[in-house]
């Protein structure tokens, strides 16, 4: 059974030094359970970039895929904004 609704995330490319791999930083806002204050929580994930089209600073959309390597479980869907 294939899962239809795959997770999609939007983030900023922080590294493109690896071959066909980019590192994307995801920033989310989460509310503290006791103080009810919003905090910025960030995480970095490695994503597969088959055509190597994204560069550092680009805003990209990534999607969850099957494991490609030890660390890669995401793939680039599209580049939303290019860095000027």
Swiss-Prot record:
<keyword id="KW-0699">rRNA-binding</keyword>
<protein>
    <recommendedName>
        <fullName>Small ribosomal subunit protein uS17</fullName>
    </recommendedName>
</protein>
<keyword id="KW-0687">Ribonucleoprotein</keyword>
<dbReference type="GO" id="GO:0006412">
    <property type="term" value="P:translation"/>
</dbReference>
<dbReference type="InterPro" id="IPR019979">
    <property type="entry name" value="Ribosomal_uS17_CS"/>
</dbReference>
<dbReference type="GO" id="GO:0019843">
    <property type="term" value="F:rRNA binding"/>
</dbReference>
<comment type="subunit">
    <text>Part of the 30S ribosomal subunit.</text>
</comment>
<keyword id="KW-0689">Ribosomal protein</keyword>
<comment type="function">
    <text>One of the primary rRNA binding proteins, it binds specifically to the 5'-end of 16S ribosomal RNA.</text>
</comment>
<dbReference type="InterPro" id="IPR019984">
    <property type="entry name" value="Ribosomal_uS17_bact/chlr"/>
</dbReference>
<dbReference type="Pfam" id="PF00366">
    <property type="entry name" value="Ribosomal_S17"/>
</dbReference>
<keyword id="KW-0694">RNA-binding</keyword>
<comment type="similarity">
    <text>Belongs to the universal ribosomal protein uS17 family.</text>
</comment>
<dbReference type="GO" id="GO:0003735">
    <property type="term" value="F:structural constituent of ribosome"/>
</dbReference>
<dbReference type="GO" id="GO:0022627">
    <property type="term" value="C:cytosolic small ribosomal subunit"/>
</dbReference>
<dbReference type="InterPro" id="IPR012340">
    <property type="entry name" value="NA-bd_OB-fold"/>
</dbReference>
<dbReference type="InterPro" id="IPR000266">
    <property type="entry name" value="Ribosomal_uS17"/>
</dbReference>
């Amino acid at each position: 059974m294939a899962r239809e609704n795959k997770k999609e995330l939007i983030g900023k490319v922080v590294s493109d030094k690896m071959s066909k791999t980019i590192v994307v930083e995801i920033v989310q806002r989460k509310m503290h359970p006791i103080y009810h204050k919003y905090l910025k929580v960030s995480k970095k994930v490695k994503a597969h970039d088959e055509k190597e089209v994204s560069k550092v600073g680009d805003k990209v959309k990534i999607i969850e895929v099957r494991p490609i390597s030890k660390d890669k479980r995401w793939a680039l869907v599209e580049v939303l904004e290019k860095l000027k």
